[in-house]
Design a protein with these regions (language model features):
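Glycine-rich phosphate-binding segment of PLP-dependent enzymes
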Residues: 53-72, 86, 91
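Conserved N-terminal alpha-helix of the aminotransferase class I/II PLP-enzyme fold
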Residues: 72-105
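Substrate/cofactor-recognition hotspot
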Residues: 16
Length: 364
């Protein structure tokens, strides 16, 4: 009896146990392991620029350290950085967010954690179009929500349609996660597509969590459009989420930010004050320089990403049994390996694309 009681008291969280480990990190670890063995491997797992953070941003951080800017800041970030983000929202996104509508976090994942903690009650549903960034459903589950996956197809350019969205809505729907430019497909929603989605969100009355982390990485004649900029009704229902990790090669600095209603921002700030307190003070100073300083390094990185995009897309499409849609944003190419399924390699039948990838990385 005592043992039974003791074992019950040591039981771990069912909520945490339901969360799946990150397969992205597993892929990255596999690539590093093979590199350590001396094999020539290029890791395509983690969404991380291979450039160093621009020098002017690093110098701003060094100055912050030397100036003693190493104390606590307000939990939701400094007014200086909020003002810089507010200006960026206005000029780049066409969005008016005052500083009290902005919450600065410890990276994009933290922003999403804040958002879903603030929005979700147990059992609330969050619609997530697939393919999706792997952390979305896990963060929703940790907040007590239920991920509702809506599969998109290659024929749809892997983009959610208003019709499919409306069909997925129930009386428990609390929010839609809309990621554009998209990780992992590289697809970009047009204004027409966004307006149709916004119409459903307004009519059915749910929030839109607009993950726009790759907003500055758009190619060709395409243009990034923020769904919150398409009218007051959708603006009021949207939490716009972005950060500096991808565009400024600052993945390790951990600065993300959101724009939302004052009510939601206040609640997210309160949540963050108890979970982590403020974002790194030095990284906040660096972020101010990133947003307000010279942008030439960003433009050079963008040009190099575009060059790689074209190269990767052509190489994949030239390979037998592989195909892809041309990515319009971010720095991903979503490979279609379905033609390989059912074929055999050294007597082993290939039944999934991950299995094919495992064979390639181990055999070649």
């Amino acid at each position: 009896r005592r043992n039974e009681v003791r074992n019950m008291s040591l039981e771990l969280s069912k909520k945490a146990a339901a969360v799946k480990p990150s397969s992205t990190l597993a892929i990255t670890a596999k690539a590093k392991e093979l590199k350590a063995q001396g094999k020539d491997v290029v890791g395509f797992g983690a969404g991380e620029p291979d450039f160093n953070t621009p020098e002017n941003i690093c110098e701003a951080a060094i100055k912050a350290i030397k100036d003693g800017f190493t104390k606590y800041t307000p939990a939701s970030g400094t007014n200086e950085l909020k003002a810089a983000i507010s200006k960026k929202f206005k000029e780049f996104n066409g969005l008016d967010y005052d500083t009290d509508q902005i919450v600065i976090s410890n990276g994009g994942k933290h922003s999403l954690t804040n958002i879903f903690t603030a929005l979700i009650n147990p059992g609330d549903e969050v619609i997530i179009p697939a393919p999706f960034w792997l952390s979305y459903p896990e963060i929703v589950k940790l907040a007590g929500g239920v991920p509702v996956i809506v599969t998109t197809t290659k024929e749809q350019n892997f983009k959610l349609t208003a019709e499919d969205l409306a069909a997925a809505v129930t009386d428990k729907t609390k929010a839609l996660v809309l990621n554009t430019p998209n990780n992992p497909t590289g697809m970009l929603y047009t204004e027409e597509e966004l307006r149709a989605i916004a119409k459903v969100a307004v009519e059915k009355d749910f929030y839109v969590v607009a993950d726009e982390m790759y907003e500055m990485l758009v190619y060709g004649e395409q243009k990034h459009i923020s769904i919150a900029s398409l009218g007051k009704d959708i603006y009021d229902r949207t939490i716009t989420c972005s950060g500096l990790a991808k565009s400024y090669a600052m993945t390790g600095w951990r600065i993300g930010y959101t724009g939302s209603s004052k009510e939601i921002a206040k609640m997210m700030g309160s949540v963050q004050s108890h979970q982590t307190s403020n974002p790194n003070s030095i990284a906040q100073k660096a972020a101010v320089e990133a947003l307000t300083g010279p942008q030439d390094s960003v433009e050079k990185m963008h040009a190099e990403f575009d060059k790689r995009r074209k190269y990767m897309y052509k190489r994949i499409c030239d390979m037998d049994l592989l195909d892809a849609l041309e990515p319009m944003g971010a720095f991903y190419v979503f490979v279609d390996g379905s033609a390989v399924l059912g074929k055999s390699y050294k007597g082993t039948k290939i039944e999934s694309v991950p299995q094919m990838a495992d064979i390639l990385i181990n055999e070649y």
